[in-house]
A protein has these predicted regions:
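Conserved phosphate- and dinucleotide-binding cores of soluble alpha/beta proteins
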Residues: 1-140
Length: 141
C-alpha cells in the first residue's frame, strides 16, 4: 500500500531540524525515559548491547531546546522498580526539563515547587497503587 502525504505536509532535513531545536523553536517534545526525578531531571540515555558507549542521540538537544518536555514511559521497569524517583540513578540527559509524564498508570505533572503532582489515573488504578509503584512522593491538587 502506498503512503501519501497529507495536504500541508512537509519534509525537513536533519540539519534544519537541529537548527529548529537548538534555536528554541520547538514548543513541545515527547521523549521516552529510563527515569524522571521529582525536580524534572531526565535520564534517557540509550545503552548498547554490543559493547559501544552509551549514547544520548538528539534527546539532549530536545531536552534543552524545547519549551516543554513530556515523557511517555512505563511506570516501572520490567522487574518492578519505579521510574519516577527522588533522584535519577542514571546519567542525566536534561536538568529540570520534564513538565509532564504519561505512564501506563496515570498522568503526572512535574511542578518546580511541588515535584510530582498526579493529574489523572488510568482506568482501574488507585492513588494508593500509583504511590506504591513510585519512588518519590506523589502530591495531589
Amino acid at each position: 500500500q502506498l503512503i501519501t502525504l497529507a495536504k500541508g505536509a512537509s519534509f525537513v532535513g536533519h540539519a534544519d531540524s537541529f537548527a529548529m531545536i537548538r534555536g528554541g523553536h520547538i514548543d513541545l517534545c515527547v521523549l521516552g525515559a529510563f527515569e524522571v526525578a521529582e525536580n524534572g531531571d531526565l535520564a534517557n540515555w540509550a545503552t548498547s548491547e554490543n559493547d559501544t558507549a552509551p549514547a544520548v542521540g538528539g534527546a539532549m538537544d530536545l531536552a534543552a531546546g524545547a519549551k516543554q518536555v513530556w515523557v511517555l514511559m512505563e511506570h516501572t521497569t520490567k522487574d518492578g522498580r519505579p521510574k519516577l524517583v527522588e533522584r535519577c540513578g542514571y546519567p542525566l540527559t536534561g536538568l529540570a526539563c520534564v513538565r509532564r509524564i504519561y505512564t501506563n498508570l496515570g498522568v503526572i505533572d512535574v511542578l518546580p515547587e511541588k515535584g510530582f503532582v498526579v493529574r489523572d489515573l488510568a482506568p482501574g488504578v488507585t492513588l494508593d497503587e500509583l504511590r506504591a509503584k513510585s519512588g518519590a512522593t506523589l502530591h495531589t491538587n
